[in-house]
């Protein structure tokens, strides 16, 4: 009986440490107060890059990412044509883009990246979108994506 209780406690402890999301080891989310200065700098850069993409919906002018801001994969995928398609859809459905609200940073221990979650605020109250910016160890954006908003990270 003791072994069973100890085993259950050990499994519970290990299960709370990290979780697997799509085969990747994801640590606990980090609040704004727990972030280091490096994480804070990455958060600011992620905010600026994400805001630049969504502000394109209001201004129709997109400044392409440079090699110091994003990986080659992100630069190739973020063409003005692709962003324009997304912006047309979002402008019709959600109205004008207002701002990004930082929610959390989730460290991805598998590939040593940080995932920054922002809630995208639009003109219409029904807009419930999330912007995720993944920053790698070189302080470059390695992924930028939008999803429907969910309170829990998936």
Language-model features, listed with the residues they occupy:
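Short solvent-exposed beta->alpha transition segments
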Residues: 64-111
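C-terminal motif of bacterial Sec signal peptides marking the signal peptidase cleavage site
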Residues: 14-15
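Sec-dependent N-terminal signal peptides
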Residues: 7-8
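Exposed beta-sheet edge and beta->alpha loop/turn motif
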Residues: 108-154
């Amino acid at each position: 009986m003791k072994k069973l209780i100890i085993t259950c406690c050990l499994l519970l402890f290990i299960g709370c440490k990290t979780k697997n999301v799509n085969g990747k080891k994801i640590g606990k989310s980090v609040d704004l107060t727990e972030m280091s200065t490096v994480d804070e700098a990455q958060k600011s850069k992620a905010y600026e890059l994400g805001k630049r993409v969504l502000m394109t919906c209001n201004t129709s002018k997109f400044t392409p990412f440079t090699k110091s801001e994003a990986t080659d994969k992100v630069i190739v995928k973020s063409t003005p044509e692709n962003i324009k398609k997304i912006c047309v859809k979002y402008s019709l459905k959600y109205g004008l883009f207002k701002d990004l609200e930082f929610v959390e940073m989730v460290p991805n221990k598998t590939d040593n990246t940080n995932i920054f979650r922002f809630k995208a605020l639009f003109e219409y109250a029904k807009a419930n979108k999330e912007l995720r910016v993944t920053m790698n160890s070189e302080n470059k954006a390695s992924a930028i994506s939008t999803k429907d908003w969910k309170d829990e990270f998936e």
